[in-house]
Amino acid sequence: MKNLVKLSLVALLTAAAIPAMATKTEPYTNQGTNAREMLVEQPIHWISVEQLKKELEGKAPINVSFDIDDTVLFSSPCFYHGQQKYSPGKHDYLKNQDFWNEVNAGCDQYSIPKQIAIDLINMHQARGDQIYFITGRTAGDKDGVTPVLQKAFNIKDMHPVEFMGGRELSTKYNKTPGIIKHKVTIHYGDSDDDILAAKEAGVRGIRLMRAANSTYQPMPTLGGYGEEVLINSSY
């Protein structure tokens, strides 16, 4: 009898030590995720400013180009203001020359320089590289963008911004002619068009991440064309 009681106690203690297996009583209604899935990184070719610096060590100075909006500047406030003023709820303002005249005249004094752009430009200028800015914006009647960029990033040898929007093109992507014109080796940008323009020009395109609260939606797919993506580049 005593042995039977002991066996019963052992069985009860063993059962208590084994965690209960949870059962899914209702089917999920949304995709969701779990802790293990969240730890799985996408197969993206990440790169850092420090890695780029080491890679370029000992090499002759090169020409590099940068897109502006969401690449070097967080300029969404300007575009949000323009949309509210010229075409609330629509994107027609992007085809309105009055908007481009206004935004390019000086709105970027309220745009926020991205830290990743500061770090990249400092690294390239320390090497003696030439910096160019190539944007998909349409030119306004006054260029207030060039001086803002020169001051924000302390550009030593500033070149006028290349406004590619609205130009007649012989290429598929509007930034390609600017990249070719300035004999660029590396082009940095946040959009698919930046990466595809670099490919079309036959140069290296490196993606910077767009801030999650950018007015430029939908968000592009990082590494979607096999390009390198800079880490910590959304700000």
Locations of regions flagged by a protein language model:
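Short, surface-exposed acidic
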Residues: 14, 91-95, 155-161
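Short, acidic loop-to-helix structural element flanking the phosphoryl-transfer center
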Residues: 103-132, 139-140
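Generic beta-sheet signal
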Residues: 62-64, 131, 185
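Ser/Thr-glycine-rich phosphate-binding loops at phosphate-binding pockets of nucleotides
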Residues: 71, 134-136
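C-terminal cap/substrate-recognition subdomain and adjoining C-terminal extension
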Residues: 24-41, 46-47, 127-129, 138-235
